């Protein structure tokens, strides 16, 4: 399943998101959600042991001036790769 997070993590039920993550899922951070990808962010730390891949939309990272602060554990994607993720994961959950 592809989970999308367009908000700051404090604005969603993050414990529920963590509970629903399954092996092989992906979490795509976009809009203000890219702040989760900042190195040392407590929400990112809670994702470290999850059996998922965390992606962040590069354009949103750049728009917020966060390029140098993003964790190396987060995969940066552009809009084309965003579309590929939506095709790859038939099921999606928007937070």
From Swiss-Prot:
Residue ranges spanning the membrane: these are none
Carries keyword GTP-binding?
no
Give the CC-aspect GO terms: sulfurtransferase complex
What domain of life is recorded for the organism?
Bacteria
> From its record, what is one biological process in GO terms?
tRNA wobble position uridine thiolation
Q: Name one Pfam family in it.
A: DsrH
Can the keyword tRNA-binding be found in this entry's annotation?
no
Q: Where does it localize?
A: Cytoplasm
Which InterPro entries does UniProt cross-reference here? DsrEFH-like, Sulphur_relay_TusB, Sulphur_relay_TusB/DsrH
What SUPFAM superfamilies does the record point to?
Answer: DsrEFH-like
Keywords attached to this Swiss-Prot or TrEMBL record, sorted alphabetically, are: Cytoplasm, tRNA processing
What disulfide bonds does the UniProt entry report for this chain? none
What family is this protein classified in?
A: Belongs to the DsrH/TusB family.
- Complex formation: Heterohexamer, formed by a dimer of trimers. The hexameric TusBCD complex contains 2 copies each of TusB, TusC and TusD. The TusBCD complex interacts with TusE.
The task this protein performs is described as: Part of a sulfur-relay system required for 2-thiolation of 5-methylaminomethyl-2-thiouridine (mnm(5)s(2)U) at tRNA wobble positions.
Please give the name of this protein. Protein TusB
The gene name reads tusB
